[in-house]
Amino acid sequence: MKKKIRYTIMLISAIAVYFSCSYVPKLNGIDISHHNVVDWKKIRKNKDIEFCYIKATEGKSFRDPMCKKHVKRAKAIGLHVGLYHYFRTDVPAEKQFANFKSVYDKVPSNLIPVIDVEENGNDFSNISMANKRLKKLIELFEQEYGCKPIVYTGSWCCLKVITAFYDCPIWLRLLHVPHILPNTTIKQAAIINNLDMNYCKDINDIIL
């Protein structure tokens, strides 16, 4: 009998953990770059979608060629729009910020800017330098825009070795990271029709 009770408790616990990890109330945002082909008519018909983050820049010189067009289309269907910068470990923070600002100043947006921190294309072998540059970039964003930027990340490497962003709002890629950080503000929870789908509990938390 005791064995049966233990088994039942374990089963109930497993089910509870599964649903607590997998359930996301509402996917209400997308993030895109020049890699995405967006069907804006479908997005407009989806009344749950409230916001769209769009890639603006990367490193010291790359500027997404579709940024302005994506912003225009997103705003035309009434979405809140934000811009993000892809962080590069091999580029000084000042040069990265100058690149982002050059696009941000010319494109209308109303969401807190985002710094995208990922392993792809980066070398984290010099952890001290990566942290130093990211910390400085966060400071430059905060000085310019009056609030800490949201930091997107989703790899175990970034979460383990990069500490500079721990006091920033976090945008967590749940497809790769199964736990939630205390300051998680946005959750990237699914890919539908080649679009990253996200959940933000309160849109006011990310409005600039």
Residue ranges and their predicted role:
Residues 15-25:
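Bacterial Sec-dependent signal peptides at the C-terminal "C-region" and cleavage site
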Residues 146-159:
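Aromatic-lined carbohydrate-recognition surfaces of secreted/lumenal glycan-active proteins
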Residues 81, 147-149, 170:
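Hydrophobic anchor at the start of a short beta-strand
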Residues 24-38, 42-44, 53-138, 142-145:
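Substrate-binding cleft of extracellular glycoside hydrolase catalytic domains
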Residues 1-11:
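N-terminal Sec-pathway targeting helices
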Residues 24-33, 38-42, 48, 163-208:
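Functionally critical loop-and-helix segments that line ligand-binding/catalytic clefts
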Residues 85, 153, 174:
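Short beta-strand/turn micro-motifs composed of small residues
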Residues 95, 157-165:
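Glycine-rich, charge-decorated loop segments at or immediately adjacent to ligand/cofactor-binding or catalytic sites
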